[in-house]
UniProtKB/Swiss-Prot annotation:
Binding annotation for Zn(2+): C73, C76, C89, C92
Keyword list, A-Z: Metal-binding, Nickel, Zinc
UniProt binding sites for Ni(2+): H2
Organism the protein comes from: Shewanella oneidensis (strain ATCC 700550 / JCM 31522 / CIP 106686 / LMG 19005 / NCIMB 14063 / MR-1)
Record's protein name: Hydrogenase maturation factor HypA
Purpose of the protein: Involved in the maturation of [NiFe] hydrogenases. Required for nickel insertion into the metal center of the hydrogenase.
Length: 118
């Protein structure tokens, strides 16, 4: 299950941002997850809940925005947003398409807290 290694890298990235911003904890992690990223949202959530327990993200909530597939057809120039995992142009049924969005997983935003000054 590659979601474990993905979450491990995500938490490491969160820890680096928290350290750079003198944060004591991360309360929210927002990611954009493309439908063609190869990452299963439910497994990612489970992995996050497991791996966050020992670090600065232990109280963090993982928020996922699912990004549909966006393609552009080289034949008819149609740009399409697709819910299914298909690279066929819905306008002309061409396979000559280019993926514009929906293949990656991106860290979009972190909410962090800093220690209160005494």
């Amino acid at each position: 299950m590659h979601e474990y290694s993905i979450v491990s890298a995500l938490i490491e990235q969160c820890e680096q941002y928290a350290k750079a911003n003198q944060a004591t904890k991360v309360t929210r992690v927002e990611i954009k997850l493309g439908v063609m990223s190869g990452v299963e949202p439910a497994l990612l959530q489970t992995a996050f809940e497991t791996f966050k327990l020992d670090g600065i993200c232990r109280e963090a909530k993982l928020c996922m925005t699912l990004q549909p597939l966006v393609i552009k057809c080289a034949d008819c120039q149609q740009e399409s947003v697709l819910d299914e995992r298909s690279i066929v142009c819905p306008a002309c049924n061409s396979y000559h398409t280019r993926v514009l969005d929906g293949e990656e997983m991106l860290l979009m935003q972190l909410e962090m807290e800093q220690a209160e000054d005494a």
